Amino acid sequence: MRYPKGSIQLNQSRDLPLLRQILRSEFVTHSQLFEFTQLNHYERSRNSFHWRMRRLVDRGLVLRQTLVAGTGDAVYSVASSAATLLQSMGEYCLVGCGRTDAEKANRNVLHAIGLNEIQLSALRAGLLVRWMGSMEIRSQNELTAFGFAKDYDAIVTVRTDIGERRFALEYERTPKAAKCYRAIAACMSQEVHVNRLLYLVANYDILRFVSGFFTKAVYPVFFGLLTDWHSYLLEMPVLDVLTKRAFPLKQALNGATPKAEAMPTATSHRLPFH
């Protein structure tokens, strides 16, 4: 079968998974995207991956930003035409809201890349069951009557030693204004779809600042360092601001009561409580 000059036939098992991953990530580096294809088993050859990406960029389905500050790598996002195509095939996205235009969202690039790394760490360890990204969350919140209390960065389902556990995730690379955290703390009592919120933050100062707004929260909110997630995953220490105690994340997810005894060696360092 012949196709019009300049057209592209999308491969169901290779091209479409690539486009879906870029859409769900919103922004993703070249190296991150290749690792996603490896871990999700839909591309094995690096040369084939390079060829496929050049093809998608050349046909205008993928937008490429070269050497975005702070990444040292090319960064991809989907073009509006590709997002519309994926939406027609059942993907959750809000094409009409301008959220797929790279030109309008450069400030979110590093945030999205950081979220990709959080997801990849769980994938590498075989812990990730499902990652519901911000685009799918926004779609559910804006288009249905059963939305979450806020637009989280992700809803994450992981495997623990006693079963699957789900939690909302917020990644704070830089702090927001105080009024934003007050609003978040106020709305969390309305959350009915997920029963844990984890804040991963870039450093101790942000942890102290953000956690201070949740000291009276009834809803379970935990705080931890991004570096600890990448090093220890479910064994990472998290802070419960209500008890002012640190304990392993898996204990928080499993609903166990914090104990006074020392944590395992990998998580024995202290988090700031005050």
Summary of predicted features, one role per range:
Residues 48, 110-114, 180:
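Soluble or luminal CAZymes and related metallo-dependent hydrolases
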Residues 37, 53, 57, 86, ...:
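Hydrophobic, Leu/Ile/Phe/Ala-enriched alpha-helical segments that form helix-helix packing faces
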Residues 1-97, 101-102, 272-274:
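Nuclease-adjacent, charged terminal/linker segments that flank catalytic cores
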Residues 13, 71, 113, 147-149:
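A generic fold-level signal
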